């Protein structure tokens, strides 16, 4: 693995005049950008993670620009970091309609309790009311827990979180049509931690059954962190390369073929709404996959679904409901473990609110070691804040719709921006529309182009397809951090 955090591009021979025009600053920045691309391109081939390489390249270029006294206006117009799939409400500038109205997205940081009282956010001064309200709710929640003799300040023996919050989250799953109870819900520090605990527990459980390392199926492109986790726990990794003809989704015929060819597969990582492609399985497509799996279940081969729900809640509600209801079939639910998170659906990436729902109540106790032997006990303040945020969203459901509207606005604007760029200098083979979900845009580049050449020519940094187990003629752009201007 290449170490990139100490890399530095030597630009000492690039002369910076004491004072120089905006045009000269842009020319200098583009020269620096070209040098940075030449330096970082080989690092990808040395095995470093593409997402981190691209993000590091952008950060170092910004640093170099400031060292050369290039003004912020030029930096922001010539360097657009769309690599990391984060969401930063403090940087939201979009306002549709009248200030303070339903389309004033600048208010989201205040409305979701991210902003402190008195922050100046792009012409809007925050009240901090929700910020303070959340702290009052934390106190109320702690009192409610203590009344039931639950003290989050001491060890939770199983490390799965307090039963009141777990019951609330089970209620959310019930609203999707899934008959689960709080005992089937375990808390985790975000989706990644939750997936890690499941993979650790399932590896032990499956090896105890067969005395062999189990196989796991990962369709690509897809989020690759669970792959690293699975590899570390001894799984045999099986990949299937999906294609644009099927909107990058695994078909029933393809699933059947893979399962027949790899009899060791016992776990299937299914991203219901996909990162990076932004396409989501329809209810019909999911049922077709279950039909294939059912034939194996009935033959005595248990294959479990690890269903990643990280982006459920970012699409149209009625479509998400239809998707989730398909899991209610008793045999499907019994073979499914769900991983959920508030990170993208509620823009709370830094809070790390995640949880696991185990469809089979009999399997749930078997997975306890993944929690008990890792975190030992979940943080008390974190649990209280988790509960406060749950109450916030339940009491103000319009917040989630407003977030969906912001995501939709940005995805639409970015697609229009990329189309305009493509008219001026053909770089994209196709700009995929997606399924009106996630915080990304997914594009195919023209032959001869890649993420580095695109950055050199446009200043827009994305993540190459290899970051998702795919080919580098594809690229993912994030819309969660940097606002997207309207195309004129």
Go through the PLM ranges and name each one.
Residues 109-302, 312-331, 337, 483:
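Conserved core of the PLP fold type I
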Residues 6-31, 35, 41-190:
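N-terminal small-domain helix-loop-helix segment of the aminotransferase-like
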Residues 21-36, 73, 109-111, 133-145, ...:
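Conserved core segment of the aminotransferase class I/II
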Residues 1-18, 22, 163, 167, ...:
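PLP-dependent enzyme catalytic core of the Aspartate aminotransferase-like
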Residues 306:
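Generic enzyme active-site microenvironment
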Residues 55-66, 419, 426-427, 437-484:
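Conserved C-terminal alpha-helix-loop-beta "cap" of PLP-dependent enzymes
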